[in-house]
């Protein structure tokens, strides 16, 4: 059977079971007509890193994720994995949205295995087990809560063994408790499989709790690039997390002053 069912609660770094996709963004610029949404973005993201991208609405963070997913093309610049175009890794990339986007006329297990051929049902069942929904395989999506629907969407991504997982506000519509449960689930699965993660979120506390690195996008540029050098599992409400969260929030809420990135670690 496919090894989806292991549980890791106290790991400190991702295992190499699935090698993550390394990313290089060289001078990425994106225009919509006369409006520049991303402006000369330069980033290096190593294999297996968990990166959170934060910023005000309209700053370009979701646009950046869409470029990485291949849903849109950059106006200029290069997206690379190693020395190859990132488009060469599209089969290893999966994207989760704020809405689960399940097909209501298909049962849960069929949504997980959507588009697959051959003997996929066992793999789909394993993926559902890994997200805690082993007993909901034959239910209809309408019978699920919002959090359960997002778990199905996560299982649908996991069945493809992604090396790059892109998360565009996937927890934004969930209640506080369900959101914390989903955060823990995503973190544990990442620790187990070792893929590269880019999470776009408006929730700075979520970014600090989950990520190895938090990047703030300001007016289409990297305004802040912070390493979260704290052991896992992270204790919510700790002084160090609160200190780092306050620093990022202060920058998010302040008027933009300089487009140059600042780097720090805590």
Curated annotation (Swiss-Prot):
- What PROSITE patterns does the entry give? ABC_TRANSPORTER_1 (PS00211), ABC_TRANSPORTER_2 (PS50893), SSUB (PS51291)
Q: Where in the cell is it found?
A: Cell inner membrane
What reaction(s) does this enzyme catalyze? ATP + H2O + aliphatic sulfonate-[sulfonate-binding protein]Side 1 = ADP + phosphate + aliphatic sulfonateSide 2 + [sulfonate-binding protein]Side 1
- What positions does the entry give for ATP binding? 55-62
Q: Which family does it belong to?
A: Belongs to the ABC transporter superfamily. Aliphatic sulfonates importer (TC 3.A.1.17.2) family.
Role according to the record: Part of the ABC transporter complex SsuABC involved in aliphatic sulfonates import. Responsible for energy coupling to the transport system.
Q: What is this protein called?
A: Aliphatic sulfonates import ATP-binding protein SsuB
Q: Which organism is it from?
A: Pectobacterium atrosepticum (strain SCRI 1043 / ATCC BAA-672) (Erwinia carotovora subsp. atroseptica)
Taxonomic lineage is:
Bacteria, Pseudomonadati, Pseudomonadota, Gammaproteobacteria, Enterobacterales
